[in-house]
Amino acid sequence: MELLDINKTLDLVKLKFYNEWLYTAHIYDEGPSDLHEKLTKEVVKTYVDPLNLRKDSVILDMGCGPGYFLDEMKERDYTNCIGVGLSPGDNKTARSKGHVVKEYDMSFIPQQDGWHDESVDFIFLRHALEHSPYPIFTLMEYNRLLKQFGKMYIEVPAPDCDRQFEFVANHYSILGEKQLAALLDRTGFKVDVFNTIEFDATITAPDQENTQVKEKYFCLVVTKQRPLDIK
């Protein structure tokens, strides 16, 4: 099959412009969240601890926020955990606690900084994939980074919920169960665990009364089953 000429089919200047617009318009600090700190503790206990990762495993926390996952892993004596994020305030908070945080686009981790193919043991991707405008590229990049049979934890908001995650300013990919499973299969991952969690939450907004809503998340553990033949 003859390959398409990318110089004719893709406007790289426009792609760069669109990305810069997203960065300047829609990146903001998560800030402290008692709910997400509590949920992260439960996630690590339920999904990460049973993996029995080596203490020197290379671990990436994509979209690390203020560093709640990094806190948990530090308490467990993991020695090689790196956060990735673009929110200046959250990065500053995480670094103030002694964590290493890199300012990378989570879909494109630079090889020139030493992030070679199959160099990572585990990726933590909690409430980050929905922020990717191109989730299939994001998952392709994580396939590149992960060692063969490396693991990844994914947690994403479910579509069509009371909370209307689709309308959050920096949410671009609120994936349903089938679409998420299909993307993982196409990018070389095997789903080991696919759970749905639901709970009641109180939403607080400035100058508005508190609102009770149903939250619904998908929680997955996946394994890199095969590398992608895209070179």
Predicted region positions:
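Conserved N-terminal segment of class I S-adenosyl-L-methionine
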Residues: 1-118, 122, 137-139, 215-219, ...
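Short glycine-centered segments of the SAM/dcSAM-binding site in methyltransferase folds
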Residues: 58, 149-151
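A short SAM/SAH-binding and catalytic strip from SAM-dependent methyltransferases
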Residues: 122-133
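A short glycine-rich, Lys/Arg-flanked "PGG" loop and its adjoining helix->strand segment in the class I
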Residues: 136-148
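Short, glycine-/aromatic-enriched active-site segment of Class I SAM-dependent methyltransferases
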Residues: 154-173
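Short alpha-helix
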Residues: 172-187
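Conserved S-adenosyl-L-methionine
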Residues: 189-200
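Core SAM-dependent methyltransferase catalytic element
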Residues: 202-231
